[in-house]
Amino acid sequence: AASDVYKRQDKICKKVGEEAAETIIAAKNADNDELKNEINDLLYHVMVLCADRGLEWSEVEEVLNERNEKIGNLKQFHTTDKLS
């Protein structure tokens, strides 16, 4: 039923949000192993979301490749946002 689809999608989206938050927290810590694990968890659940929506991972990669090919696609960092 439609409510089952909504519940499943809601559960997946909540998990993606949780993993995104955990990735942000790990990024602020000094442990790169923790960060790698959290990025892995986030990507896994994003892939689950894609599969649930019938979206092939290759379609996501295609968009990434298109963005990399665009000239001037780099965002300008604020002074406080620049990476060292």
Q: Where are these predicted regions, by residue range?
A:
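N-terminal "mature-chain" segments and other terminal, solvent-exposed stretches
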Residues: 11-14, 77
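Short glycine-rich loop/turn motifs that provide flexible caps or phosphate-binding loops at active sites
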Residues: 7, 16, 71
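Short leucine-rich amphipathic alpha-helices used at interfaces
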Residues: 30-31, 37-38, 75, 81
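An amphipathic alpha-helical micro-motif enriched in hydrophobic residues
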Residues: 16-24, 32-54
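Short, small-residue-biased leader/transition segments that mark boundaries at the very start
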Residues: 1-6
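C-terminal end-helix/capping segment
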Residues: 55-84
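Conserved acidic
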Residues: 8, 12, 31-34
